[in-house]
A protein has these predicted regions:
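N-terminal beta1-alpha1 cap of cysteine-dependent amidohydrolase-like domains
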Residues: 1, 13-111, 119-127, 131-168, ...
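Bacterial N-terminal signal peptides
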Residues: 2-10
Length: 182
């Protein structure tokens, strides 16, 4: 009897199409298309005045791509001159979203700028401008497709297939991770 009840419970819980609420730090049509399905509610935190009211609903948070992160967020005054547009409101919002997701163990994804913000919010730093700080033969801001190979330092088979030591990455960035937090 116990096994029968357990199987019914598992079967019933697997059949539920529970709605999941995903909070985007700043929405765009591409993110909405990527996430859109019948079981997902997408909330754009950037357009909501009281973000505390939506944080309690979050099943996941996505920090999206966008403007440069203010170098003052990682104590860098030198790179202020080479940064593009800085959105102070967004920097503050994404730190709040990161802290909430981290403290509450809510799944968190960072895309482009979002991944950089995750690094900064964890205590890391960024290259404010990759070409001027480390030099590169890769043109990061040309028109068209911008991809190049990078060499992997950690070739963990948990993330990449065995034997993988290089991967292709998007290069439409002039900022990148510099120091990773411990």
């Amino acid at each position: 009897k116990t096994i029968f009840i357990l199987i019914i419970t598992i079967f019933c819980s697997c059949q539920k199409n529970e709605l999941k609420t995903i909070i985007l730090s700043k929405s765009s049509e591409n993110y909405v298309k990527w996430m859109e399905n019948d079981n997902t509610i997408i909330l754009d935190a950037y357009t909501i005045k009281n973000t505390d009211s939506i944080l309690v609903l979050a099943d996941g948070v996505i920090l999206t791509g966008g403007e440069d992160i203010n170098p003052l967020q990682y104590n860098d005054t030198i790179n202020l001159a080479v940064c593009g547009d800085i959105n102070y409101q967004r920097d503050i919002l994404e730190r709040k979203l990161f802290d909430f997701a981290f403290e509450n163990k809510i799944p968190l994804i960072g895309v482009c700028r979002g991944m950089q913000m995750m690094n900064v919010a964890s205590g890391g730093t960024l290259y404010g401008d990759i070409p001027s700080e480390i030099g590169t033969t890769v043109i990061h801001r040309n028109n068209g497709e911008v991809n190049h190979k990078i060499v992997l330092v950690d070739t963990s088979s948990l993330i990449f297939p065995n034997g993988t030591d290089t991967i292709m990455v998007n290069s439409w960035h002039h900022q990148g991770l510099k120091i990773m937090p411990n």
